[in-house]
């Protein structure tokens, strides 16, 4: 927070999520770029949720929805969108619903449909990124390919406020030896995170993953 106050740059974005906010002073932001930090232990997570007492309940329900396997749904291949976790912080999330759904959910991104070599999209066939990464880490613990992308190439078509695009870029998992012990590391790259509204939740959800 001190870094943001002392070194942050003032920015005036013209769009926020899927909203046009040009000229709206409420959205003027103080921003820190290329900021890196390292957590070696989480400690008491209560400090991540000071800004909103509902956040702890929300992240627990949101995490369940994120890792839900669509193949376990009564309607096979059915992703969770919008789910019910958003109702815990309804004032934060409801404004971004479009025709009763979000432009994307993490459940859709962690277990996604795929496009074949002919450009045909197969949303009815699930590519389970969580399982693929887990299996590769077991097969090859020294891998540098255990990456789960959240921001997909097609998101570039919707920048500028046409649709919401993920604030998370990817999760990169590495198993490396530190002080004689093998440890699982996660590198979590975000293009943006509201420090008050979302940052603590993002940290906790990445840690649980």
Roles of regions detected by a PLM:
Residues 1-208:
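Terminal, non-catalytic protein-protein interaction segments that mediate quaternary/complex assembly
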């Amino acid at each position: 927070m001190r870094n943001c106050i002392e070194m942050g740059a003032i920015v005036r974005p013209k769009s926020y999520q899927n909203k046009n906010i040009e000229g709206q002073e409420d959205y003027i932001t103080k921003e820190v770029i290329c900021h890196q930090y390292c957590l070696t232990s989480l400690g008491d997570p209560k400090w991540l949720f000071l800004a909103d007492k509902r956040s702890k309940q929300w992240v627990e329900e949101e995490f369940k929805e994120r890792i839900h396997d669509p193949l376990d749904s009564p309607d096979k291949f059915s992703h969770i969108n919008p789910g019910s976790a958003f109702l815990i912080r309804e004032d934060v999330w409801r404004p971004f619903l479009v025709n009763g759904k979000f432009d994307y959910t993490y459940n859709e991104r962690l277990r996604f449909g795929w496009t074949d070599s002919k450009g045909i999209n197969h949303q009815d066939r699930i590519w389970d990124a969580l399982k693929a990464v887990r299996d590769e880490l077991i097969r090859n613990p020294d891998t540098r390919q255990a990456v789960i992308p959240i921001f997909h190439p097609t998101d570039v078509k919707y920048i500028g406020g046409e649709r919401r695009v993920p604030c998370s870029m990817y999760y990169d998992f590495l198993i490396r030896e530190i002080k004689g012990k093998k440890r699982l590391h996660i590198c979590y790259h975000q293009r943006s995170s509201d420090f008050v509204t979302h940052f603590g939740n993002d940290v906790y959800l990445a840690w649980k993953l």
